[in-house]
């Protein structure tokens, strides 16, 4: 489902832990990392799509998380011309996204990237809140900056109330399955 401007409706998901770190996932078989995201199906609300994508991409269910915030507006990014599929109709030139900030209420062990026969990710780790803004692929950076700026007021109090960590370096976890 592509809108009249050529953008595909999509949801983005930022999952934070009780220390205010965010889940950073490695795309399957690649060296690129990002937040979980995915398209909204016809007849599906953004929230319904978010829960579906949450399970498909990281194996978490509604009971495992709580919604802390959503972006006020849809945020858009354009795909680089080399990634646009010009032979499909209608042509999709980018994504328009509604973002959700979730707090993980269950254990790290409940994260399972093997719920699909074609997994999106093959590993993940907890990183500092602002880390993804500098590390995501360049054409998504502006959207990530805007998302994190909007969610910062919700996550920063979590970081301030969190006990100090024994291991400050991010732990890298392989897929479960």
From Swiss-Prot:
Gene Ontology, cellular component aspect: cytoplasm
EC number(s) given by UniProt: 3.6.1.-
PROSITE patterns: NUDIX, NUDIX_BOX
GO biological process, one term: mRNA catabolic process
One of the Pfam families matching this protein, by short name: NUDIX
Disulfide bond listed as a keyword: no
Required cofactor names: a divalent metal cation
One Gene Ontology term of the molecular function aspect: mRNA 5'-diphosphatase activity
UniProt-listed InterPro entries: Nudix_hydrolase, NUDIX_hydrolase-like_dom_sf, NUDIX_hydrolase_CS, NUDIX_hydrolase_dom, RppH
Motif annotated as Nudix box, chain positions: 38-59
CDD domains referenced in this protein's UniProt entry, alphabetically: NUDIX_Ap4A_hydrolase_plant_like (cd03671)
Highest rank taxon of the organism: Bacteria
Domain Nudix hydrolase: 6-149
Record's keyword terms, sorted: Hydrolase
Catalytic class of the enzyme: hydrolase
PANTHER family per record: M7GPPPN-MRNA HYDROLASE (PTHR23114:SF17)
UniProt record similarity statement: Belongs to the Nudix hydrolase family. RppH subfamily.
Function: Accelerates the degradation of transcripts by removing pyrophosphate from the 5'-end of triphosphorylated RNA, leading to a more labile monophosphorylated state that can stimulate subsequent ribonuclease cleavage.
Protein's name according to its UniProt entry: RNA pyrophosphohydrolase
């Amino acid at each position: 489902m592509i809108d009249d401007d050529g953008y595909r409706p999509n949801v983005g998901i930022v999952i934070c832990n009780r220390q205010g770190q965010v889940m950073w996932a490695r795309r399957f078989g690649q060296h690129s990392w990002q937040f979980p995201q995915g398209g909204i199906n016809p007849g599906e609300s953004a929230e319904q799509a978010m829960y579906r994508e949450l399970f498909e991409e990281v194996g978490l269910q509604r009971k495992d998380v709580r919604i802390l915030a959503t972006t006020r507006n849809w945020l858009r990014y354009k795909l680089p011309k080399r990634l646009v599929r010009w032979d499909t109709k209608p042509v999709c030139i980018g994504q328009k996204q509604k973002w959700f900030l979730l707090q993980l209420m269950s254990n790290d062990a409940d994260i399972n990237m093997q719920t699909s026969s074609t997994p999106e990710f093959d590993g993940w780790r907890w990183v500092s809140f602002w880390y993804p803004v500098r590390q995501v692929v360049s054409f998504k950076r502006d959207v990530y900056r805007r998302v994190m700026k909007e969610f910062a007021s919700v996550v920063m109090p979590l970081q301030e109330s969190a006990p100090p960590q024994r291991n400050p370096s991010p732990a890298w976890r392989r897929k479960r399955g």
